[in-house]
């Protein structure tokens, strides 16, 4: 059995389904990790994985995800939550005006094992759209 430490329990099901194919049972452990900021996904993931492992006392999984806009390579990346909160829908519309709306949603899954980060990456290509309530 392996734990996924997350403050967002709906993230559990897709990971549990994938790991079940490998005969690995996954359990969710709700845990609030600090919101780490860095321009590098792996730097954020490594710090989160180490903190989670230390808090739980055993290796466990953590994730980090973000949006990558083709018009702005590498942006916003791991800073997606901060950028969306700061700019809002209208700011994102202005940012993308006249540029490509192609984007990738990137998700990393990581585990801190014996002082080393093990990680996996998945991507979903899409077109960025701004939705208004």
What residues fall within each predicted segment?
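Anionic-ligand binding patches
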Residues: 2-3, 10-133
